[in-house]
Amino acid sequence: MTFDPHKKLYISDVTLRDGSHAVRHQYSIRNVQDIARALDKAKVDSIEVAHGDGLQGSSFNYGFGAHSDIEWIEAVAEVVTHARIATLLLPGIGTVHHLKEAYDAGARIVRVATHCTEADVSRQHIAYARELGMDTVGFLMMSHMTTPQNLAVEAKKMESYGATCIYVVDSGGALSMQDVRERFRAVKDLLEPSTQTGIHAHHNLSLGVANSIVAVEEGCDRIDASLAGMGAGAGNAPLEVFVAAAERLGWNHGTDLYTLMDAADEIVRPLQDRPVRVDRETLALGYAGVYSSFLRHAEVAASKYGLSTVDILVELGRRRMVGGQEDMIVDVALDLLRQRGDAARQAAV
C-alpha cells in the first residue's frame, strides 16, 4: 500500500474509559468534565467514556465505579462541542439495552469489544449500533494471542456484521513493531478498502507510541491514546507523546500539542494513586502477554496472600487467561500458595 503522510489522522482519546482502570474506576463528575474540556479544547476527534470494562462494567468482578456510565457520559456531553463521545461495549457485560441508554445520554460512537478469536458474539450488538446510526467499531482485544491471518478472519466477520472500522487491540502490551505490521497487513488485505482500521496500544513494553506509528505507516486510520498514558497496566500510548512524534514526522493530527501536554501534567497525572509507568509489575504484563487490567486485581491478591505480583501475572500468562477471567486471579494465587507450601514441606523432609 502507499502511505499518505498528509492524511488526517483520527485521534481517539481513551483517558475516560481505559484510564478509569488507573484510578480503580473512581473518576468524579468534576474529573471527567475537567479532562473532557481539555481534550475538546485540544480538538481530539473522539472521547471514549465508560467504566474501564465498558458499559455495565461496574460490578464485584471488575470493580464498582464511583458513578454510572450514563452519569459520566451525560457529564461529558454537557461540556464538549467539538469531540464526539464514544463508549465501549463488551458483549456479555453490556447489552443492546445499555447501548441505547448510552446513545440517549450522548454517545455516538461505540466500540464493540471481543476477544480476538470471538468476533461471533458481536453480531447482535454491531447490528443494533448500526440501526441506531452510531459510528460502529469492531474491537479485537488481546490481538497478540492469535496469528495475523486468524485475526484478519475475525476482523472480516465484524465487517460483515456492519462494523465500519476494525481495531487491532494490544490489550496486553505484548506486540512488537513487526507483530503490528504483520497484523495490519493481514487485516487490510481481507477488509474492504472502505473499512477503516484502528490501533489501541498499551505501553507495557514501552512500545505504545512506536507501535502506533508503525500502524499509521501501514495505513491505520484511527489511533487510541490517553493523556499521560492513563490506562490499564503501564497505560496506553501517551497521547501527548504520540502527537509530538506525529508532529515531528509532519503528520496531520489536527490537535493542539501544548494543550494536551498541560492537561496530562496538570489534570490527569495528579489523579494517579499508582504511577502509570513501566515498572516490574507492568513490564511483567507485556512480557507474559497478560490482559493489562489484571494488574490491580493481581496486586490485591498478592498483598492478601503474601505473594509476588509478578509471579501471579506470569502464571496468568502461562495459563493464557483473557479478559473476563478476573475471578481466576485469586484461584491462581491460591494455587501458587499451595505450591509454595508443598515445596516447603518437601524441603523439610
UniProtKB/Swiss-Prot annotation:
Residues binding Mn(2+), per UniProt: D18, H200, H202
Gene Ontology annotations of biological process type: catabolic process; L-leucine biosynthetic process
GO MF term list: 2-isopropylmalate synthase activity; 4-hydroxy-2-oxovalerate aldolase activity; manganese ion binding
Q: Where is the active site?
A: H21 (proton acceptor)
User: Has keyword Transmembrane helix?
Assistant: no
Site note Transition state stabilizer applies to: R17
Residues given in the record as substrate binding sites? R17, D18, S171, H200, Y291
Homology family: Belongs to the 4-hydroxy-2-oxovalerate aldolase family.
Protein name listed in UniProt: 4-hydroxy-2-oxovalerate aldolase 1
Q: Which organism is it from?
A: Azotobacter vinelandii (strain DJ / ATCC BAA-1303)
Underlying gene: xylK
